[in-house]
Regions:
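Glycine-rich, aromatic-flanked loop segments that form ligand/cofactor-binding clefts
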Residues: 1-5, 66-92
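Metal-associated gating/positioning segment near the N- to mid-region
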Residues: 1-70, 151, 175, 182-183
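Conserved, mostly hydrophobic/aromatic
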Residues: 2, 45, 78, 122, ...
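Active-site gating loops and adjacent loop-to-helix segments of metal-dependent hydrolytic enzymes
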Residues: 8-29, 88-104, 138-146, 181
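Short, acidic/polar
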Residues: 30-40, 108-123, 171-177
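Divalent metal-dependent hydrolysis catalytic cores, especially in the metallo-beta-lactamase
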Residues: 33-59, 75-84, 127-138, 166, ...
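Active-site core of metal-dependent hydrolases
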Residues: 88, 132-189
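Active-site gating/metal-coordination segments in enzymes
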Residues: 94-154
Length: 189
């Protein structure tokens, strides 16, 4: 079996909220949980997972993948995306005093140059796929709205493709899906 959309570095929100996992849990604790999640996933019969973002845990998915590949811990084969790419200001955590820089659950980038740099950096750090949020809940009343232009999404796809990587997009709106499809995204979640 293949799990096509996992987040091994998260645990259920009824245990701890997403904000608390990103802002309060040490990365080492999140990795320790991920080791258990990887083992349980394999024991459930999944031999491969596509892990679609560390949600604030940096590049820990790359190390988890390496530990499994080297036989240090049991787990399924992993295809990793490292840090999802989001438009500046569009993702979470939100609602904090604007004077403070708050750790983000994904990597913010904008424009052709910024997106090119971020995609290449993620590839350098071990991303097998690139994940982008084509839309998110950042409208005036928190409703989902597209986050990137078609040109920006096309840039992400072109840079990823130049190194043989595919792009997966989070999209829940018709316009976000349309833009992602036109840009050449391989998978929409």
């Amino acid at each position: 079996l293949i799990e096509g959309h996992s987040h091994l570095l998260l645990h259920p929100y009824n245990e701890t909220s997403w904000d608390n996992q990103v802002l309060r849990e040490p990365e080492a604790l999140r990795v320790a949980r991920a080791v258990n999640h990887a083992r349980a996933t394999l024991q459930a019969g999944f031999t491969t997972v596509r892990d679609l973002g560390t949600e604030g845990a940096g590049y820990s998915d790359v190390g988890l993948k390496q530990a499994i590949e080297q036989g240090i811990i049991p787990g399924p084969r992993m295809v990793v995306t490292t840090r999802a790419i989001v438009a500046t200001g569009s993702y979470a955590p939100k609602g904090f005093d604007p004077r403070w820089e708050i750790p983000q659950g994904a990597e913010e980038a904008d424009g052709i140059e910024g997106l090119t740099r971020v995609v290449r950096d993620q590839i350098k750090r071990g991303a097998d796929w690139i994940k982008v949020y084509a839309d998110y809940r950042w409208g005036p009343n928190g409703e989902p709205q597209p986050t990137f232009t078609e040109t920006e999404l096309r840039t992400i796809v072109e840079v990823a493709a130049s190194s043989g990587r595919a792009v997966v997009a989070h999209a829940s709106t018709a316009e976000g899906m349309r833009r992602a499809t036109i840009a050449g995204v391989v998978s929409i979640e």
